[in-house]
Regions:
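Extreme N-terminal "head/tail" segments of very large remodeling/mechanoenzyme assemblies
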Residues: 1-78
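Extended, charged alpha-helical "arm/stalk" segments used for dimerization and assembly
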Residues: 83-154
Length: 154
């Protein structure tokens, strides 16, 4: 599997008529702030842009926000864009590497792009996990430890 490092995130909410840009440190990041300043929104938008749909609803969250995530993958820069259900990967020359409007297709495309190759064994059958498996940590919600986890998309 390739190494993925976030560089920056840009968000545009047409509904709220607001935009935001966040730069990430190349080695470590701590998302810190008071309640209702956007920590969960930023985290959720990162995973949504990459194709995950973490559990839970955020109050007042604009799910039509357009996002552009810049990431370094194995020392090469790529751009990941999400607008509604459409997602795309662009290389550093802003050429389309892959795009789709279907989430199930995106999981396969992104999993292949990242060389994600998790094999799940069940009884006598083996299946390759979709790209959703890369996001297991996004599905583990800290305030829901006692409740059942829903990892159906793996």
């Amino acid at each position: 599997m390739k190494t993925l490092r976030f560089k920056s995130m840009q968000l545009l909410s047409e509904r709220e008529k607001k935009a935001r840009a966040v730069q990430f440190h190349p080695n470590r990041n701590l998302i810190l702030g008071l309640n209702h300043v956007g920590k969960s929104t930023l985290t959720k938008q990162i995973f949504e842009t990459l194709g995950a749909a973490p559990m839970g609803k955020l109050e007042g969250w604009d799910n039509t926000t357009i996002t552009l995530l810049t990431a370094i993958i194995d020392d090469q820069e790529f751009y990941f864009m999400k607008q509604f259900s459409n997602r795309a990967i662009f290389n550093s020359e802003v050429q389309v590497v892959a795009s789709t409007g279907r989430l199930a297709e995106w999981a396969k495309v992104f999993g292949a792009f990242m060389n994600f190759n998790l094999v799940l064994s069940e009884q006598k059958r083996e299946d390759r996990a979709s790209g959703y498996g890369m996001y297991v940590s996004a599905f583990l919600h800290q305030s829901r430890w006692g409740l059942e986890w829903h990892l159906a998309h793996l």
